[in-house]
């Protein structure tokens, strides 16, 4: 009986510590130090309504927008409840057909030359919000033409939204597609 009582006391104690105190302290510190990130890194539009998160990719298919990495989520694209890769190998005929269709779509939309991998292959999560600067540059001509802008104007906005490697050596340069498209919309609506 004594063993059951001590086990029960330890269970209740650790439940309170690990299930209540620790999460509350970590959440409080996160909200104090990184308030935007702790709340989901939401991005707001010009009317101050939340339009997405800078951490989760979103579908853009209109020619006036930069297109993100393809989504590999099931049921429908960019389904954050079903995050994950396709698990198709590089020799899978269905996968190769899908990649070829994506390359054709980009060439039909005006992209010239070789297409960066980030525009035809989904990321491991299937929800990557970023593309490489090269993947963005290949879309500049299309976006500029549809928006009635010069390529140089679009390039300047792209350069302003290109993030370099963290600490100068971690990761790769990247462009958040949602933030870039919102910047283009905000410029257009001035």
Curated annotation (Swiss-Prot):
The cellular location(s) given in this protein's UniProt record come to: Cell inner membrane
Q: Any idea which UniProt keywords this protein has?
A: ATP-binding, Cell inner membrane, Cell membrane, Ion transport, Membrane, Nucleotide-binding, Potassium, Potassium transport, Transmembrane, Transmembrane helix, Transport
Which topology term describes how it sits in the membrane?
Answer: Single-pass membrane protein
Recall the GO molecular function terms of this protein's record.
ATP binding; P-type potassium transmembrane transporter activity
A GO CC term attached to the entry: plasma membrane
**Source organism's superkingdom?**
Bacteria
Please verify whether the record's keywords include Thylakoid: no
UniProt keyword annotation of Glycoprotein present: no
So where does this one cross the membrane? 9-29
Family from the record = Belongs to the KdpC family.
What is the stated purpose of this protein?
Part of the high-affinity ATP-driven potassium transport (or Kdp) system, which catalyzes the hydrolysis of ATP coupled with the electrogenic transport of potassium into the cytoplasm. This subunit acts as a catalytic chaperone that increases the ATP-binding affinity of the ATP-hydrolyzing subunit KdpB by the formation of a transient KdpB/KdpC/ATP ternary complex.
Q: How does it assemble?
A: The system is composed of three essential subunits: KdpA, KdpB and KdpC.
Task: Tell me the HAMAP family matching this sequence.
Answer: KdpC
What is the protein name given in its UniProt record?
Answer: Potassium-transporting ATPase KdpC subunit
